[in-house]
Swiss-Prot record:
Coiled coil residues, start to end: none
Cofactor section: Mg(2+)
Any one GO molecular function term: RNA endonuclease activity
Name of the molecule in the record: CRISPR-associated endoribonuclease Cas2 2
Source taxon at top rank: Archaea
Annotated residues for binding of Mg(2+): 8
Subunit: Homodimer, forms a heterotetramer with a Cas1 homodimer.
Alphabetized HAMAP family for the sequence: Cas2
Role description: CRISPR (clustered regularly interspaced short palindromic repeat), is an adaptive immune system that provides protection against mobile genetic elements (viruses, transposable elements and conjugative plasmids). CRISPR clusters contain sequences complementary to antecedent mobile elements and target invading nucleic acids. CRISPR clusters are transcribed and processed into CRISPR RNA (crRNA). Functions as a ssRNA-specific endoribonuclease. Involved in the integration of spacer DNA into the CRISPR cassette.
Gene behind this protein: cas2-2
EC number: 3.1.-.-
Length: 91
């Protein structure tokens, strides 16, 4: 499955830890606070628990969208082309 993770976190330290966790699970940043990538259900469950621990008590809003490959393949991007990515293709 593919996921798109978007977040709004006011605290720099917490925001950086969330970004590091998303990268550690193989997701790639496509915007400042948006990550995308392929992840299996067991790892997604682990990631959700890790994000809950990281953001406990913080002013943090994280939304995880589960999307299928078709959604990734038909995404529309406006702006310069993104750098080559290993875990997802967006055009």
């Amino acid at each position: 499955m593919y996921v798109v993770v978007a977040y709004d976190i006011t605290e720099d330290e917490v925001r950086n830890k969330v970004a590091d966790a998303l990268k550690a699970y193989g997701l790639e940043r496509i915007q400042r606070s948006v990550f995308v990538g392929r992840i299996n259900p067991a790892l997604l469950k682990d990631l959700v628990e890790r994000l809950k621990r990281i953001t406990k008590g913080a002013n943090a809003d994280i939304t995880i969208f589960k999307v299928d490959r078709r959604a990734i393949d038909t995404a529309i991007r406006i702006g310069p082309p993104p750098p080559a990515r290993k875990n997802v293709d967006l055009y």
